[in-house]
Each structure stands twice: as structure tokens, then as C-alpha cells.
Amino acid sequence: MPQTVCVLGGGVAGLSAAQELAERGFHVHIYERKPVMGGKARSIPVPGSALPDHKPLPGEHGFRFFPGFYKHVIDTMRRIPYGAHGNAFDNLAVATRILLARAGQTEITWVARCPSSLEDLRVFLMELFTPLGVPPEELAYFVSRLLIVATSCPERRLMEFEKIAWWDFIAAPRMSKAYQVYLGEGLTRSLVAMRAEESSTRTVGITQLQLLYGLISPDRVFDRLLTGPTSDVWIDPWTQYLRSLGVEFHPGTRVAGIEVDGARVTGITVNDGPRIEADFYIAALPVEVMASLVTDSLKRAAPSIANLDKLQTRWMNGIQFYLAHDVPVVNGHAIYLDSPWALTSISQRQFWTNFDFSQFGNGSVKGILSVDISEWQQPGVIYGKPAQECTAEELEAEVWAQLKQHLNEGGATTLNDADLLSWFLDPDIEFPNPSAATNAEPLLINTAGSFQYRPEAQIELENLFLASDYVRTYTDIACMEAANEAARRAVNCVLVASNSTAPPALLWPLEEPAFLKPLQELDRIRFGLGLPHHLASR
């Protein structure tokens, strides 16, 4: 008789764990508080937007993108059937450009190059960032700091860079305003949704480099985007596949407590439902939810999760604009560097090649501009209020105005008010009172020194394992890839604990250019001797 695994949470982590387990013969139950699966990745039908014979307009928590360094999620998608003979991976399109838009200034487009040495990489990075208008000597310093991270050994990254805020590592306080705005704040907020002033140099530096390596690796794409609404081309086929494997779904189930006896979980209590029992449990819950379930008894049984409440979250949520005319903007991401709210966007129709837009809403929408807001605590350009203090209508007006400041320059009118038919704000942004918003699904951020509070997938309990983006992973940043990797790690713990003979779920370390390896080995020797990085004094 197959052993039973209870997966708490039906987002990317929970679905990933369920797939790996079900493919290995386990009987899996997924419990999810929302009425649908997919977590932050799910599509959200816009209420009241459709004619009787049409589909609702597709909304979302935020647009999905799959950088070139994603391997775990990609492997999972290749195993999800789609259509007659394809799989979900077939629903990814390669984005060929990334646009850096500035208010009232010429836009910058990044394209790929192929450096093969450290000097090539330095020249490439200098050329990449030069159009931002940062003083040359400051730009050279910033590039040198990136190269230090690139050529550092893992030990230095963890034991030294983990404790330093990126803002301090790149010496932003003593640099020009352009340096601070574009290289310090803009790239950090937009590329990794983190604040340079508080975020770990290890996480920010490595993630920025991984994204940039997508521009320099001939065998890696910079980015991929879905060819349709996320639920249509990924989440729904995924849940259908899991059902075919025998996975049972329990939507609308909110976890109330985790019961322990010694080193074992004995059951899960839920609101408005019977107590849950299983052979093994995987907690695939966001950090703020899991932290709320960690009681004193659970802390005593599993000390490694006692400090989850010390991990911090910030807001990163989306708004979609539905347009009467399509505005492609760029074949990929647009980053709005002068936006006080750290906006990024994707114009989706150019990638949704197999979807008939006339079947959405009332048939009048010709384009969708999906925008992520990564900074919620800085004043906007219209009302002078932070996003957190705005009403939904003020949020829409502010984001639209900030987009126009960046795109409508040089006499061009890329965005026209008359083309804006409607908009949709992530419903996780809630408005309990008119003067302040709340966020039901914030995003984990890796503040300097926070690694010590993050547990492994394997904790002290014999039958409870963790699968969420706060778990220690190679990926090391809150995203779908980290969630999927953590799920694989949790599944491997189940395999060991159950004495299964099934092969373990595959794991991939982050890839770095081969020409960096000798320099990293040199730094390992220097670090072991207590010496600084060899580039630090230059």
C-alpha cells in the first residue's frame, strides 16, 4: 500500500512536491486555503469582465518570467503533458530584449554578447551600463564590485558577503545620485525586487550576475515568458496531470495548527474540517504563514524553525492594463529606472500567439500591459503618497502616470489615455480602510545576515519537511525556481525517511562561466588564509 504524504500549500512548491512524489508512487493530498491551485503564479479571472459567450479578462498577481538560470522549474514543465503530444515547456517563448526606460531620456535596450575571459566580462559590463550616464570612475568601481562577487569562492560569499548590505558593498552612500538611483536602487529593486540598503550582498550580487550571465552565455537564454495566461498554459494542465497520477486536492482548506509528539508530527488541524493524518508531511507554505504556525512546542521539537518570524517580507504585486491597441514596448521586459515605485512590465500579446484576444472580455481588448510594483513605501508622482497609502484608483493613476513618464518621450506617445479600456489590481492588495492597503501575499526578501534564520528542507522532525522559497537552496532568492528546488529537497527527505528505492529528485547548482573557476579557486585559498579578495585593493 502506498505511503501517504500531506502537502500543505498548493502553490508552485506544493504542486512541484506533489509531482515528484506522485511520479514515485506516493499517495498525495494537497491542502490549499484558496479555492484554486497555483498560489502567486495562478491566473485570476477579472470579475464581471466577460460577455456571456466570452472568457473573463486574465488578471494575475504578477507576470511570470523564467530567467535563463531556471533549471528546476523547466525540468518540471517538461514532464507536464500539454495538448496531444506536447508539454508545458512548449508554452515558453524566448524574450530577446530587456528595455531600460528612463523618464524623459533615451531608452536603453540590452542584447546578448559572449565574453570568454574576465577582461571580456569587465568590458561587457562597462558597455552594458555606460548608457545610464553614471560617471565613468564610479561605473568602473561598480563593475569591479560585481567582478569580486563573480570571482569569489562560496565560502567568502556565505561567511563574508552574506553579512553585508549590497548598498554598502557597492559604496553607494559616497557615490553620485545617478549611481545610487540606477545602479544601487533601480537595478536591485527591478531585477531582484529587493532594497539595496537592506539586502544581502551574497543574494543580490549572485542573482544579478545570474541574470546577466543569460546575456553572455551562448547556450543560455536571457529570459522566457509564457505564451498565454499562466493557468491556461501551465497551472491547469499541471493539476490535470497530477489528478491523473492520483493526487487529491482539497481547496478552501486553511491550516490551523501542526500537532507534534516528540520528534514526530501526529496530525494537522484545519479550520472547518476534520483533523488530517498522513505518514509524512510537507509544509509548502509562505514564510509568514508557516511562522504563524510555529508554536512553542514546535520550536522545542524543531529549533531550526524557531526564528522564521525574523525573516522579512516586502510587497511585490501587479496591475494589468487592458488596451484598445496593442503596445509591444519591447520583446521582453521593460524596467522603469526612474519610477519611484520600481515598475517593471511585459506587453503580453506579442507572446500569446495562440490565444484569440477577441474571445476575452467583450472582445475589444487588443493588448495587455502587465506591470509589477516592487516599491510600496516611496511617494508617487501624482499624489505624493506611498503605494501602501493609496486607494486602488490612486494606485492605477500613479502607475499609469509613471509608465507614461518613461515611454512617452521625445514627442512619441506610446501610451495613450484613450486606449486604456480597463485595469485590474492584484486582489491580494486589500483595502480595509481608505487610507491604507494590506497585502495578503507578500514576498520574502533576504536581508543581510538572514541566512542564519533560514532552515534546510530537513528539520529536526522525522516526518515533516519544508518546501518553500525561504528554505536554503542553490537558487537563494524568493521565486518559483527556489520554491521548486525546495520542493525537490523536501521530496528527497521523504524518500530517505520512507526507505524508498525510487531515484531522488534532481538538483542543479547555479552555473557560472567556466573562465571564472580558477579565480574562484584562488580566492578559496586566500579566504582560507584570512586574506581579502585579490581584486579588493585595486
Regions found by a protein language model. Give the residues of each.
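Short hydrophobic core segments
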Residues: 8, 255, 276-290
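Glycine-rich FAD pyrophosphate-binding loop
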Residues: 22-49
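Dinucleotide-binding Rossmann-like beta1-alpha1 core, especially the glycine-rich loop
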Residues: 51-142
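Active-site/ligand-binding neighborhood in enzyme catalytic cores
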Residues: 142-257, 261
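C-terminal segments that line or cap access tunnels to active or ligand-binding sites in enzymes
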Residues: 216-226, 278-280, 288-454, 458-485, ...
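Conserved beta-strand-loop-beta-strand element in the redox core of flavoprotein oxidoreductases
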Residues: 257-276
